[in-house]
Amino acid sequence: DHENACYFGELLGNTPGVTVEDGVETNMVFFNVEGTGMTAEDFRDRLIEDAGIRIGANDLYRMRAVTHLDISREGIERAATAVRDLARSNLL
C-alpha cells in the first residue's frame, strides 16, 4: 500500500550507507545499499538470516521493498529497523 511504502522510505531516509530513490509512487520502495559495502544479494540474505525480513535484490546494489495491505505499521517499522541496523553494523 502506498502510504506504508512512503512511510518505509521516510524511515530509511537518513540511514548511513543507504540511499532511497526519490519518488515513491506505488507500493514499492527502491533503495541502494552500495554505501554499506555489501551487494544487494548479500544485504538481502543477511536481512533474511538476521531478522526474517524479505526484501528483493533488484540489481547489484539496488533493493526493492514491496508493501501491501497485510503489512502493518509495526511490520514496516520492524523492516526499517532491520535495514538500518544491518547497514550500521556493516559500517563499523
Predicted regions and their residues:
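Flexible, glycine/charged-enriched surface loops at secondary-structure junctions
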Residues: 15-24, 56-59, 91-92
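Structural motif
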Residues: 28, 53-54
